[in-house]
Protein backbone atom coordinates (compact mmCIF):
# COMPACT_ATOMS: atom_id res chain seq x y z
CA UNK A 1 0.00 0.00 0.00
CA UNK A 2 1.47 3.41 -0.94
CA UNK A 3 2.47 5.80 1.77
CA UNK A 4 -0.08 8.60 2.21
CA UNK A 5 1.63 11.97 2.50
CA UNK A 6 -0.07 15.13 3.66
CA UNK A 7 1.73 17.45 1.25
CA UNK A 8 0.84 20.66 3.08
CA UNK A 9 2.14 19.31 6.38
CA UNK A 10 5.28 17.92 4.73
CA UNK A 11 5.90 21.23 2.94
CA UNK A 12 5.51 23.15 6.21
CA UNK A 13 7.86 20.73 7.99
CA UNK A 14 10.50 21.09 5.27
CA UNK A 15 10.25 24.88 5.43
CA UNK A 16 10.50 24.99 9.21
CA UNK A 17 13.54 22.70 9.20
CA UNK A 18 15.15 24.69 6.37
CA UNK A 19 14.68 27.92 8.34
CA UNK A 20 17.31 26.89 10.88
CA UNK A 21 19.69 26.06 8.03
CA UNK A 22 19.18 29.55 6.55
CA UNK A 23 19.83 31.06 10.00
CA UNK A 24 23.03 29.10 10.42
CA UNK A 25 24.46 29.65 6.92
CA UNK A 26 22.91 32.90 5.73
CA UNK A 27 20.89 33.40 2.59
CA UNK A 28 23.93 33.66 0.33
CA UNK A 29 25.52 30.56 1.86
CA UNK A 30 22.55 28.35 1.07
CA UNK A 31 21.87 26.43 -2.10
CA UNK A 32 18.93 24.17 -2.84
CA UNK A 33 21.35 21.24 -3.04
CA UNK A 34 22.77 21.99 0.42
CA UNK A 35 19.30 22.42 1.91
CA UNK A 36 18.11 19.15 0.34
CA UNK A 37 21.11 17.33 1.81
CA UNK A 38 20.50 18.92 5.22
CA UNK A 39 16.83 17.90 5.11
CA UNK A 40 17.59 14.38 3.90
CA UNK A 41 15.56 14.71 0.71
CA UNK A 42 16.53 14.70 -2.93
CA UNK A 43 17.03 18.00 -4.70
CA UNK A 44 14.13 17.14 -7.03
CA UNK A 45 11.86 16.50 -4.03
CA UNK A 46 12.79 19.90 -2.62
CA UNK A 47 12.10 21.55 -5.99
CA UNK A 48 8.73 19.78 -6.07
CA UNK A 49 7.67 21.82 -3.05
CA UNK A 50 9.72 24.98 -3.64
CA UNK A 51 10.57 25.95 -7.25
CA UNK A 52 13.24 28.47 -6.20
CA UNK A 53 15.41 29.36 -3.23
CA UNK A 54 13.36 32.53 -2.81
CA UNK A 55 10.14 30.46 -2.67
CA UNK A 56 11.74 28.29 0.01
CA UNK A 57 12.83 31.37 1.97
CA UNK A 58 9.29 32.77 1.77
CA UNK A 59 7.87 29.47 3.04
CA UNK A 60 10.42 29.49 5.87
CA UNK A 61 9.45 33.05 6.75
CA UNK A 62 5.75 32.15 6.82
CA UNK A 63 6.36 29.14 9.07
CA UNK A 64 8.63 31.02 11.48
CA UNK A 65 6.24 33.97 11.65
CA UNK A 66 3.46 31.63 12.77
CA UNK A 67 5.40 31.33 16.04
CA UNK A 68 5.34 35.08 16.73
CA UNK A 69 2.92 35.19 19.62
CA UNK A 70 2.29 37.63 22.39
CA UNK A 71 3.50 36.20 25.71
CA UNK A 72 0.44 35.80 27.90
CA UNK A 73 0.63 37.85 31.05
CA UNK A 74 -2.88 38.26 32.37
CA UNK A 75 -3.36 41.50 34.18
CA UNK A 76 0.04 42.84 33.13
CA UNK A 77 0.37 46.41 31.91
CA UNK A 78 0.98 47.19 28.25
CA UNK A 79 4.54 48.17 29.12
CA UNK A 80 5.15 44.82 30.85
CA UNK A 81 3.64 42.93 27.91
CA UNK A 82 5.81 44.83 25.39
CA UNK A 83 8.86 44.13 27.56
CA UNK A 84 7.95 40.43 27.61
CA UNK A 85 7.55 40.37 23.82
CA UNK A 86 10.85 42.22 23.35
CA UNK A 87 12.58 39.77 25.69
CA UNK A 88 11.08 36.83 23.77
CA UNK A 89 12.45 38.24 20.49
CA UNK A 90 15.93 38.97 21.88
CA UNK A 91 17.70 35.58 21.76
CA UNK A 92 17.36 35.16 17.98
CA UNK A 93 17.46 38.82 17.04
CA UNK A 94 21.10 38.99 15.92
CA UNK A 95 20.99 35.90 13.73
CA UNK A 96 17.63 36.93 12.27
CA UNK A 97 18.91 40.40 11.37
CA UNK A 98 22.09 38.97 9.83
CA UNK A 99 20.00 36.59 7.72
CA UNK A 100 17.60 39.36 6.77
CA UNK A 101 20.34 41.75 5.65
CA UNK A 102 22.00 38.95 3.68
CA UNK A 103 18.67 38.20 1.98
CA UNK A 104 18.04 41.88 1.19
CA UNK A 105 21.56 42.60 -0.07
CA UNK A 106 21.43 44.12 -3.55
CA UNK A 107 17.68 44.80 -3.50
CA UNK A 108 16.38 48.30 -4.11
CA UNK A 109 14.13 50.05 -1.61
CA UNK A 110 11.19 49.41 -3.94
CA UNK A 111 12.03 45.70 -4.19
CA UNK A 112 12.27 45.46 -0.41
CA UNK A 113 8.92 47.23 0.01
CA UNK A 114 7.32 44.77 -2.44
CA UNK A 115 9.06 41.66 -1.10
CA UNK A 116 6.49 39.15 0.14
CA UNK A 117 8.78 37.69 2.82
CA UNK A 118 9.33 41.18 4.25
CA UNK A 119 5.60 41.87 4.16
CA UNK A 120 4.86 38.60 5.99
CA UNK A 121 7.47 39.33 8.65
CA UNK A 122 6.41 42.93 9.18
CA UNK A 123 2.72 41.99 9.33
CA UNK A 124 3.33 39.29 11.93
CA UNK A 125 5.38 41.56 14.17
CA UNK A 126 2.98 44.46 13.71
CA UNK A 127 -0.01 42.26 14.60
CA UNK A 128 1.69 40.97 17.76
CA UNK A 129 2.42 44.51 18.93
CA UNK A 130 -1.03 45.79 17.91
CA UNK A 131 -2.60 43.06 20.02
CA UNK A 132 -1.00 44.69 23.05
CA UNK A 133 -1.06 48.44 22.35
CA UNK A 134 -3.74 48.76 19.68
CA UNK A 135 -3.44 49.62 16.01
CA UNK A 136 -2.82 53.35 16.50
CA UNK A 137 0.33 52.86 18.61
CA UNK A 138 1.59 49.64 17.01
CA UNK A 139 4.00 51.05 14.41
CA UNK A 140 5.72 53.46 16.77
CA UNK A 141 5.96 50.79 19.47
CA UNK A 142 7.38 48.24 17.04
CA UNK A 143 9.98 50.74 15.83
CA UNK A 144 10.97 51.44 19.44
CA UNK A 145 11.24 47.71 20.17
CA UNK A 146 13.40 47.06 17.10
CA UNK A 147 15.69 49.93 18.04
CA UNK A 148 15.92 48.64 21.60
CA UNK A 149 16.74 45.14 20.35
CA UNK A 150 19.38 46.46 17.95
CA UNK A 151 21.10 48.62 20.57
CA UNK A 152 20.90 45.77 23.07
CA UNK A 153 22.47 43.44 20.52
CA UNK A 154 25.30 45.92 19.89
CA UNK A 155 25.86 46.20 23.64
CA UNK A 156 25.93 42.43 24.02
CA UNK A 157 22.84 42.19 26.20
CA UNK A 158 20.50 40.53 23.68
CA UNK A 159 18.02 43.40 23.82
CA UNK A 160 16.88 42.64 27.36
CA UNK A 161 15.04 45.44 29.06
Per-region residue spans from a language model:
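An amphipathic alpha-helix signature
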Residues: 15, 58, 83, 122-130, ...
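Amphipathic alpha-helical segments used for helix-helix packing
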Residues: 90-119
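Hydrophobic alpha-helical connector segments
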Residues: 59, 69-95, 141
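Short, Lys/Arg-enriched N-terminal segment that forms or immediately precedes the first helix
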Residues: 1-3, 82
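Hydrophobic alpha-helical segments that form the core
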Residues: 98-105, 134-161
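Helix-turn-helix
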Residues: 2, 10-13, 17-55, 59
Amino acid sequence: MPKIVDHDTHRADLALRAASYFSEHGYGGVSMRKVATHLGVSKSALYHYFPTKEALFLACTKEVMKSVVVPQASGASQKAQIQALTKAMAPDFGSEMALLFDYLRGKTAEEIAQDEAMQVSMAAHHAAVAEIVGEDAAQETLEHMMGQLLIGYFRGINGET
